[in-house]
């Protein structure tokens, strides 16, 4: 079932006449793991911002369950439908990892962090004292326990070693296939792309289905 879609999306910056994204159309289904790839400057970050309701298209519609999100509240779309895993992690820096995770699900436990490889002694430490890779684990754990049906992730394995990155990819796939979430990952990682159900490529502002994953 389609949960998120792009319909004839065009996007340009206010001070430019050139479209960064040109007539994008895509449908994303619940229970699937998507990878979005492309060279630097291809528009991947803008693409993700539009899906998240952080920005609005110049022309076209972004729809959740068939409804144009512009007809409602962008903030409600982000709060109720989306959980973000961005490169700046979006963590509350004065809280601990466990407190951050419980912001989206009060029933979350330390086990949600332990299974992502965060050491137990770090769970009650201020997140500012964690490394980039450790903060990345917290952000992913928060997304996984969220009740939001869609996870949007920007390079979620970027600060992780190869072994941990592989585990994270498996967990994201599980979130899609077993929990029914729609997981969309912007990535440069061949590992993530290969593991995905579907690979979409952004090139010169155009979106095309590059290939299926596993």
Regions found by a protein language model. Give the residues of each.
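Hydrophobic anchor residue at the start of the ABC signature
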Residues: 140
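Catalytic Walker B motif of ABC-type/P-loop ATPase nucleotide-binding domains
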Residues: 151-154
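ABC ATPase NBD coupling module
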Residues: 69-83
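Conserved ABC transporter NBD signature motif
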Residues: 60-68
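Helix-to-loop junction immediately C-terminal to a conserved catalytic motif
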Residues: 52
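Conserved ABC nucleotide-binding domain
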Residues: 112, 116-128
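Conserved ABC ATPase signature
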Residues: 126-130, 134-136
């Amino acid at each position: 079932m389609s949960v998120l879609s792009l319909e004839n999306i065009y996007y340009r910056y206010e001070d430019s006449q050139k479209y960064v994204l040109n007539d994008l159309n895509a449908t994303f289904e619940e229970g699937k793991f998507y990878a979005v790839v492309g060279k630097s400057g291809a528009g991947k970050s803008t693409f993700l911002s539009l899906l998240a309701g952080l920005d609005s298209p110049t022309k076209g519609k972004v729809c959740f369950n068939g409804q144009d999100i512009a007809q409602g509240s962008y903030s409600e779309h982000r709060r109720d439908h989306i959980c973000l895993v961005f490169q700046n992690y979006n963590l509350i820096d004065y809280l601990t990892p466990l407190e951050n995770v419980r912001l989206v699900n009060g029933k979350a436990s330390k086990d949600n962090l332990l299974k992502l490889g965060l050491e137990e002694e770090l769970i009650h430490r201020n997140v500012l004292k964690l490394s980039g890779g450790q903060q990345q684990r917290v952000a992913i754990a928060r997304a996984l326990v969220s009740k939001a049906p869609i996870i949007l992730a920007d390079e979620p394995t970027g600060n992780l070693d190869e072994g941990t990155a592989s585990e994270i990819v498996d967990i994201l796939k599980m979130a899609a296939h077993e929990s029914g979430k729609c997981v969309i990952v912007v990535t440069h990682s061949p590992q993530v792309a290969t593991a995905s159900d579907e690979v979409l490529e952004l090139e010169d502002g155009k979106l095309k289905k590059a290939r299926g994953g596993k």
